[in-house]
């Protein structure tokens, strides 16, 4: 998918394209030269241009017969099931029991509209395991959907795949309950390339603020929706297929490379029929996403604690999705919207089992992840490849050892640390246990080809190496050929005698046990303290630890708890020669960036903007162009250690305002008193207050606020509809800092004064005109009022604190010295002599 937009914030669309290398015979990307060469060679060897036969297999239409069984209390799902079928000249008796390991607990399944191919088996279904003909070495693993069986049988060295035919409905081959049973023998390693087998004649069914810098369990309660095209294509196997895809996506989110404990939980499954007025699904991916996002909100409940509530929704469709100029899009989602009920949604074009990575990719966008080729990611990922991770813009194969790039891990961590994942902290009461078997056990290579390229496609064997890329049969201009989308075989797909695929490699069955046992992670030691973010004035330094002792494996639990700690450093005052505050320096760094305003020539004077900035945005670098008055967020974060505001001693740490004392120590309880003395008792200053009512036209002097004044507050009240007086500030040199030259500032603003001091002004049009600031002033200010009319009912009051004069010690006069001398002599005369006999 290609992401549109350039800002990492919420609201941008993300799209994904499969096939970093060419995808053959598909409109997504052009044909590979290697396959064209293969076709030419085959055409020269085979006059008919038909490729040779694939792996040996046999197929039969069978009619499973339910003999007896019992149901689970309160659910209606079978606890035991005895089933018989005739195949390959033999009677197979399946003795099945309910498998609690893949029980679908807490899953709500809804069928909306008319979908006759599904309604015959619309019960939620259950998973059954057992034996065949009582032989202990045999294995039956099936999904029972009320009238259809789907799964794998392993019997006497053969592997048999059982699935409903035409959704279990009547067809030309037999009566109700018709299934197809395919017997597949192990690959012999010999034989011709492959052959395009005749088609079977029908498609095969198929919160709010979390602790900062802490690793907390997140549960993404997900609504999964399948449209009518999905129902028509997959038939009775749709539900099992969706759960298999979501299980693979959930497995990706469990990988430790994401550096967060994220659990993808499917809580509701909705299947749409042709008669349902659902979302408008069409070729335009953007319009489909907008329609689905609006539609899914109507299914949600507002309370996060409600069992029917979901945190995000994902739509699967067989519709070919298109972007602005091409139809390369396989999915789309808004960025950074996971807890926004109106926009936490994604769409996925079903493309076979690899759709699990499309779903993971789109949900990655919902978690604020960017594409790995974006500018921020290139700097974070370093020289790593941008095409081997889940968030690659165009991808052929996900690295099983590191599916998430460092950039993806960084963005989701920052996103959650900043409180955007508050809705994910509640643990579902009845979690859904997704299928635990490897998908390749339920969907062999032939089935994977059908899911990807259509019902007529089959696996092309003996194209080395096995497991690395799935090659499937197809036709081009009437000629048989093999094609691939470069995705690996699904994990668990048989690839040889007693061998199966895992992570794109063909391994012995004994080695697969290493991938079945979950291993929880453990924290490693704390690392050393890093560099201080400031050289003076109070900086921040960090120390972190990783979940590496051991690293979690196979879906094992990721470490929980504090992963990063921080402390204050370099808290001493900066040199007195510093003219700008730390935030002013950061704004001034953009003064020579002329590309921000194309029509404004020359450098710009950027100053911090405090007024009108929401509390949650205090740690963004919001600066105002002094000449134009416009203000912008120039950086998503200020440098660590920057004060959150002029009126606070708290400091910004990784984009969050963290409490600090006036001594610049994070966590300290020291406060400024009214005199702006750190830890003082307020005795060093006195309050000065007064009012003013002698209004005359023009500028009127009210009071001179002296140097060192603190906690300044000026309030002017009157009839806002007929106001005729306004506050003004005059500097010692005669210039005006506010509302001079009969020019008013109508909106709220920060009045920047010499000495890196600022006062907050409400604006001339405010209902109550105010001017306030903590100080202390570096030079005196003259408070004035500008009278522009009849000042009826106008009232002005002011107050501030001024330092108390230090009492001077008078020099003693000669008389004082004589008096003190007499007192000392009298004391000495009265004392007894030490040692007198």
From Swiss-Prot:
Top class in the EC scheme: hydrolase
GO terms (BP aspect): extracellular matrix organization; proteolysis
Residue ranges annotated for the Peptidase M12B domain, each copy included: 218-428
SMART domains reported for this sequence: ACR, TSP1
Alphabetical UniProt keywords: Cleavage on pair of basic residues, Disulfide bond, Extracellular matrix, Glycoprotein, Hydrolase, Metal-binding, Metalloprotease, Protease, Secreted, Signal, Zinc, Zymogen
Residue numbers spanned by region Disordered: 166-191
Domain (TSP type-1): residue spans on this chain: 520-575
Domain Disintegrin, residue spans: 437-519
Name this protein carries in UniProt: A disintegrin and metalloproteinase with thrombospondin motifs 4
Organism of provenance: Pongo abelii (Sumatran orangutan)
Lineage, opening ranks: Eukaryota, Metazoa, Chordata, Craniata, Vertebrata
Gene name tied to this protein: ADAMTS4
């Amino acid at each position: 998918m290609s992401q549109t937009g350039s800002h990492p914030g919420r609201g941008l669309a993300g799209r994904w394209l499969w096939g970093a290398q060419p995808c053959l015979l598909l409109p997504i990307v052009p044909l590979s030269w290697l396959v064209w060469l293969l076709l030419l060679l085959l055409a020269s060897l085979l006059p008919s241009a038909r490729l040779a036969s694939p792996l040996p297999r046999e197929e039969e239409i069978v009619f499973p017969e339910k003999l007896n069984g019992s149901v689970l209390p309160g659910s209606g799902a079978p606890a035991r099931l005895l089933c018989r079928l005739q195949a390959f000249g033999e009677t197979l008796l399946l003795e099945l029991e309910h498998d609690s390991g893949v029980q679908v607990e807490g899953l709500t399944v809804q069928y909306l509209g008319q979908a006759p191919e599904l309604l015959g088996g619309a019960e939620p279904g259950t998973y059954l395991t057992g034996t065949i003909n009582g032989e202990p070495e045999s294995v039956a693993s099936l999904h029972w959907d009320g009238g259809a069986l789907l799964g794998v049988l392993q019997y006497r060295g053969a592997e048999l795949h059982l699935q409903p035919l035409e959704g279990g409905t009547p067809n030309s081959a037999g009566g109700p309950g018709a299934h197809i049973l395919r017997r597949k023998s192990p690959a012999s390693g010999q034989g011709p390339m492959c052959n395009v087998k005749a088609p079977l004649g029908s498609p095969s069914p198929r919160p709010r603020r979390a602790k900062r810098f802490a690793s907390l369990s997140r549960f993404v309660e997900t609504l999964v929706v399948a449209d009518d095209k999905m129902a028509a294509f997959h038939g009775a196997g749709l539900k099992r297929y969706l759960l298999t895809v979501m299980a693979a996506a959930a497995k990706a989110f469990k990988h430790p490379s994401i550096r967060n404990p994220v659990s993808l939980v499917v809580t509701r499954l909705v299947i749409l029929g042709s008669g349902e007025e659902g979302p408008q699904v069409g070729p335009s991916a953007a319009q489909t996403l907008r329609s689905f996002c609006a539609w899914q909100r109507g299914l949600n409940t507002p309370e996060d604690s409600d069992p029917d509530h979901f945190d995000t929704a994902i739509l699967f469709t067989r519709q070919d999705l298109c972007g602005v100029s091409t139809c390369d899009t396989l999915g789309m989602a808004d960025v950074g919207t996971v807890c926004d009920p109106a926009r936490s949604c994604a769409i996925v074009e079903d493309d076979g089992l690899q759709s699990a990575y499309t779903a993971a990719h789109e949900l990655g966008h919902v978690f604020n992840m960017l594409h790995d080729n974006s500018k921020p990611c290139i700097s974070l990922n370093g020289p790593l490849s941008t095409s081997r991770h889940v968030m690659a813009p165009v991808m052929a194969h996900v690295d099983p050892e590191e599916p998430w790039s460092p950039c993806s891990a960084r963005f989701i961590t920052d996103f959650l640390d900043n409180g955007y994942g508050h809705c994910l902290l509640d643990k579902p009461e009845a979690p859904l246990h997704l299928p635990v078997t490897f998908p390749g056990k339920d969907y062999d290579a032939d089935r994977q080809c059908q899911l990807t390229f259509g019902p007529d496609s089959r696996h092309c064997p003996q194209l080395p190496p096995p497991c690395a890329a799935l090659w499937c049969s197809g036709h081009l201009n009437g000629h048989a050929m093999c094609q691939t989308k470069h995705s690996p075989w699904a994990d668990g797909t048989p690839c040889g005698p007693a061998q199966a695929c895992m992570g794109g490699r063909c391994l012995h069955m004994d080695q697969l046990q290493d991938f079945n046992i979950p291993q929880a992670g453990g924290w490693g030691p704390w690392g050393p303290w890093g560099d201080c973010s400031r050289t003076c004035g109070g900086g921040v330094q960090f120390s972190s630890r990783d979940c590496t002792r051991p690293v979690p494996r196979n879906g094992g639990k990721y470490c929980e708890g504090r992963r990063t700690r921080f402390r204050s450093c370099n808290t001493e005052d900066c040199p007195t020669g510093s003219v700008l505050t730390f935030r002013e320096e950061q704004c001034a760094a953009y003064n020579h960036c002329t590309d921000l305003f194309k029509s404004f020539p020359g450098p710009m004077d950027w100053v911090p903007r405090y007024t009108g900035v929401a509390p949650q945005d205090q740690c963004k670098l919001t600066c105002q162009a002094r000449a134009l008055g416009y203000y912008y967020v120039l950086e998503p974060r200020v440098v660590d250690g920057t004060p959150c505001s002029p009126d606070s001693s708290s400091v910004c740490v990784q984009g969050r305002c963290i409490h600090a004392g006036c001594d610049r120590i994070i966590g300290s309880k020291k406060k400024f008193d009214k005199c702006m003395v750190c830890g003082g008792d307020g005795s060093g200053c006195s309050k000065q207050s007064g009012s003013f009512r002698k209004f005359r036209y023009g500028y009127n002097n009210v009071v001179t606020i002296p140097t060192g004044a603190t906690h300044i507050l000026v309030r002017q009240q009157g009839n806002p509809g007929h106001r005729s007086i306004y506050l003004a500030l005059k500097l010692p040199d005669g210039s005006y800092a506010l509302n001079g030259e009969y020019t008013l500032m109508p909106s709220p603003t920060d009045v920047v004064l010499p000495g890196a001091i600022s006062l907050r002004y409400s604006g001339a049009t405010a209902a109550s005109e105010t001017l306030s600031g903590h100080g202390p002033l570096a030079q005196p200010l003259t408070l004035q009022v500008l009278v522009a009319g009849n000042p009826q009912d106008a009232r002005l009051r002011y107050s501030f604190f001024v330092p108390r004069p230090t009492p001077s010690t008078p020099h003693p006069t000669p008389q004082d010295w004589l008096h003190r001398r007499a007192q000392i002599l009298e004391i000495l005369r009265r004392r007894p002599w030490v040692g007198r006999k």
